Amino acid sequence: MTLAELKINESCEIVSVGGEGALRQHFLDMGLIPGAKAKLVKFAPMGDPMELLIHGYELTLRLDDAKKIEIKKISDIESENGNIKSPNKQIPHPGLGEGGKFHNKKEEHPLPDDEVLTFALAGNQNCGKTTMFNRLTGANQHVGNFPGVTVDRKDGSIKGYDNTLITDLPGIYSMSPYSSEELVTREFILKEKPKGIINIVDASNIERNLYLTMQLLELNIPMVIALNMMDEVRENGGSVYINRMEEMLGVPVIPVSAAKNEGIDELIDHAIHVTKYSEVPKRQDFCDEDGEDGAVHRCIHAIMHLIEDHAKAAEIPIRFAASKVAEGDSKIIELLNLDDNEKHMIDHITYQMEKERGLDKSAAIADMRFRFISKVCEETVVKAKESKSHKRSSRIDKILTGKYTAIPSFILIMGLVFFLTFNVIGARLQSLLEMGIDKLGNLVDGILTSTGVNPVIHSLVIDGIFTGVGSVLSFLPIIITLFFFLSILEDSGYMARVAFVMDKILRKIGLSGRSIVPMLIGFGCTVPGVMSSRTLSSERDRKMTILLTPFMSCSAKLPIYVLFTSLFFKKYAALVMILLYIGGILTGILVAIIMKNTVFKGNPVPFVMELPNYRMPGMKNVIMLLWEKAKDFLQRAFTVIFLATIVIWVLQTFDIHFNMVTDSKDSILAALAGIITPIFVPLGFGNWKISTALLTGFMAKESVVSTLSVLVHGNSEILAILSPAGALPLLVFCLLYTPCIAAIASIKRELGIKYAVLVVIGQCLIAWIMAFVVRMIMII
């Protein structure tokens, strides 16, 4: 019987795990190991993928992949039960390294005072790692509750300790190189060799998190464990025997709450202490010499002796290298530069281990780790029957991931987000800001007139800077409002559910459910959308997602939509904007289907993802994100757009002999724009001023509006040079043509110059074709 045959609320024990290579290793790392007990919670609304409860957390799995896992049915397993027992009275927590308990001062060899203490901040996705980074460094960084929020390494010094450098690494589940994020983290630790590791462990899901911890301990680097979210554990009636956990793991364990700023000072003290004195983990061997793990123990130790010289030469910690060689990690084996004879000996050693253990080598290593983790949890973790957050999540999921309610809920939520952004909150705030900018402009205009400032300077300030930059600034409330709602959806954990719900739909166009998140982020800004695609383990899925993300209309295009819909489609402005967003999505789907059947043939990778509990979005996190986005927008408004505005003003104010013109049609700009204007004549907007605005939009989409504001004299002139039959094709062209230079740069960074050029040319061509189709429909 396979896992795919299991029915809802039925439980099973895994007998064997199929698949091969990195995919199978990923299954094992996620806890799908022989002997593990699981329960089928539900199916996605489309009947695929499924949601499993295993090791106390929810995991998604497609039916095609579930068919590779052999099971046997068992009686019902407890949903979130850990080791249920009454906690003892409060026990003091002296901790490793404190009071000389584990620190021998006679043998200490502290690092020089002037040496920078470098730390790697490592942990699973959704463990609160980025929030911890903000606490430790004071840095402002986006915090979300979807797997893979951190897509780049972020550096900062610990507050109050200038001689430190802490790096926030991507959230990962193991040190196996399945996704690019896991590879980034592993390569950073192995190559850059931080002097200390701060491992963030979610205290409400210790069993899941300790799998990575065990591999980090094998690296023989000074390390502390931050047991995060302890406030939630206590609220649920749970507890952790910290001292016993320290003894079993051999490193300091500090109970903390990054969200409530509890235990942070103690964590910093421990981290700096163990790193300063190079106190490596006391334990790296987790398999018993006897019993079921005896064969694994003998195998790893035999390999350690065999590869010792190679590991030293490659500067890879020997225990870590041996474990990875034992489980068949090809990248580590390659780095060790073993000869054929040594490889044959390793094959014999692992074959003997498989024969004695009754499991293949990868499953045996994973099973050994989970056995030790179970032992740690049995002796140290006191769990309540079910956490409040899990109960709340189950109730919410009945609606948001329900068979008949999930898709309508998604449409309703996104529709509400756009309605509030464009018609209620954002629009009203925009009106207030516009009034303020107009009053300030009139005030400055009066001052410049009364002081007799040179007419050229006067024109530059009022007609150039105030008109151009001011017009873009007025759209800040709409952009911030959209980011506000998107960040709440992401921070709450809803985005992970959207991926779960939409997986089967996206698979029809050749993508994975995980691809929905970069594309949804793309509605805010294409750049982070492209960057967040690094969470996708498949190169094929990643490339397709990056190429499709620009079709999701970014917030920088909002000023264009608002300007033209308010002028030409006032009664139906909201409807037209919603149709534009839908049009971008449908075009992306069409392009995806074409790519799926041509350049990107093949199937998307398995959808194996943890579903985090819903959490109330932290308002501080949301406000920090909004401030970052507002700051970024303002920086662009006063740099790229400011410079573009001045350049546009100069080009449209002077002729080629730098004489001031009375009519802008005689300007340098008119001559330059005239070259490309004929291209847009069939689309209904063959005017040099509009052509110029579209050109500057390549720098930043907000520049389209600011450029037009400089070139035309009020909205009446726009109405004179455009008709509704030309305005709608123009909106479609703006929706689909090349993304801004920052987005192109991020695409180049991820995929190379060839794909970046392809996006520019391809999207301009698609935009022209779609705008032409709309033009033909409008004039029929």
Question: Where are these predicted regions, by residue range?
Answer:
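Hydrophobic core segments of alpha-helical transmembrane domains in multi-pass membrane transport
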Residues: S409-L420, L482-S487, T565-L567, L580-I594, ...
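Conserved C-terminal guanine-recognition region of P-loop GTPase G domains, centered on the G4
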Residues: Y161, R186-P252
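Canonical P-loop GTPase G-domain recognition
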Residues: V233-F286
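Transmembrane helix-loop junctions at the membrane interface of multipass transporters and ion channels
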Residues: S555-I578, A742-L751, A771-I780
